[in-house]
Amino acid sequence: MKLDIINREKVYSRMESIPNGRASDVIIPGCLVLEGGAFRGLYTQGLLDFWMQNDINFQTVIGVSAGALSAAAYMSGQIGRSARVNLGYRHNSNYIGVKALSKAHSPIRLDFLIHDYDQIEPLDMERFHDSRRRLVVVATNCQTGPSSLKRATALILSWA
């Protein structure tokens, strides 16, 4: 599948200003909790990029919904990755909108983020699985209702 940005005239005009690079290997003891909130998560992602640029890499991260997706990029140490996909593909009907709704029964296709976009900018799985760090995601059981905490692994990411 070739991924192009649809509606090129609507591409984020400051894509080149999004930071790029890798976070250092410095790990800070402590826990960070990232809430969800769909595209409000862009603010969180910008803060995480700033922290990674300044060697603030927490040992444990708990993510809920969009916060879990932001946490995956943070744990992989990929500065700017979340902003690039969300700002670069915000007008792509394979990612968001009616076409996405018809494919994924949701206005945002999480499988696009996890599978399709990963072909363009792969998540650094070696860094993601750094044994010094821990990522926990909150998952809701759609059949029973209660939520539970799950240690994030590549397997859990592939469920989306």
Label each residue range with its predicted role.
Residues M1-P29, C142:
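Small-residue-rich anion-binding loops in enzyme active sites
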Residues K2, R8, V26-I120, L149-A160:
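Patatin-like phospholipase
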Residues I18-N20, L48, L123-R127:
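Intrinsically disordered, low-complexity segments enriched in polar/charged residues with Gly/Pro
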Residues R22-S24, E126-H129, A139:
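Short secondary-structure boundary/capping segments
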Residues R132-T153:
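Internal, conserved structured core segments that host functional sites
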